[in-house]
Amino acid sequence: MSTVVSEGRNDGNNRYSPQDEVEDRLPDVVDNRLTENMRVPSFERLPSPTPRYFGSCKWFNVSKGYGFVIDDITGEDLFVHQSNLNMQGFRSLDEGERVSYYIQERSNGKGREAYAVSGEVEGQGLKGSRIHPLGRKKAVSLRCFRCGKFATHKAKSCPNVKTDAKVCYTCGSEEHVSSICPERRRKHRPEQVAAEEAEAARMAAEKSSPTTSDDDIREKNSNSSDE
């Protein structure tokens, strides 16, 4: 590359080339700093994307790692995945557990889901379910569907129930299963159960009270006419 002597660019001893002029025009990237207004705010500075909602766990499948929560205000069933639960170790929810969360649309377009799920106080850890699936840690307890107890055995090898009869794992009775257990209904629908019990008591009281037969009415009317 040819070089030329440029006045003001050298002290007479150093030669100056066009390449030097190009380098002089390049910005000084090292000294370039973002101003305060140009900095991207951190996550802590960002406002919450949506309001914080509150609800309770409707059910949660600990084996598959997902379930649903019921929103307190709308009563909507919101999908929840274990990856969105604020807890350490095995992540799950207990049935009826109180939670708070944010809501967003699901990526597959099938309704909405709860995320950043924690206790009623934001950031508070969750209790989770006592039921754990059998995995590498065989000592983890799970609920047997035959005896209703938390143990390390499965229902097909239950040592506590020798017959083929199933046991309600809600109350332990052999007369019914958990799906129709009155204790389960009383726990989750107390107002409806109380109304049904009150109606049954009223009908029982009517049946036990003495009633006046048609013959008694005719006899009473006959006595009144004779007088």
From Swiss-Prot:
Residue numbers marked as site, Cleavage: D31, N32
Annotated SMART domains: CSP, ZnF_C2HC
UniProt protein name: Protein lin-28
Residues that span the membrane, as ranges: none
Species per Swiss-Prot/TrEMBL record: Caenorhabditis elegans
Family: Belongs to the lin-28 family.
Pfam families (alphabetical): CSD, zf-CCHC
InterPro entries in UniProt: CSD, CSP_DNA-bd, Lin-28_RNA-binding, NA-bd_OB-fold, Znf_CCHC, Znf_CCHC_sf
Binding positions (Zn(2+) 1): C144, C147, H153, C158
Regions of compositional bias (Polar residues) in chain numbering: 1-17
Positions of the CSD domain: 52-120
Residues binding Zn(2+) 2, per UniProt: C168, C171, H176, C181
Encoding gene, per UniProt annotation: lin-28
Function: Heterochronic protein which controls the choice of stage specific cell fates. Regulates the timing of the second larval stage events (L2 events) in the hypodermis. May negatively regulate the larval to adult transition via the suppression of the microRNA (miRNA) let-7 during L3. Through this regulatory role, controls the timing of the sexual maturation of the nervous system. Also has a role in the fox-1-sex-1-mediated determination of sexual fate. Plays a role in governing the developmental timing of male tail tip morphogenesis.
PANTHER family tied to this protein: PROTEIN LIN-28, PROTEIN LIN-28 HOMOLOG
GO BP: any one term: neuron maturation
Record note on quaternary structure: Component of a complex at least containing lep-2, lin-28 and the long non-coding RNA lep-5, which mediates the degradation of lin-28.
Lineage of source species: Eukaryota, Metazoa, Ecdysozoa, Nematoda, Chromadorea
Result when mutating G55S: In n1119; loss of function
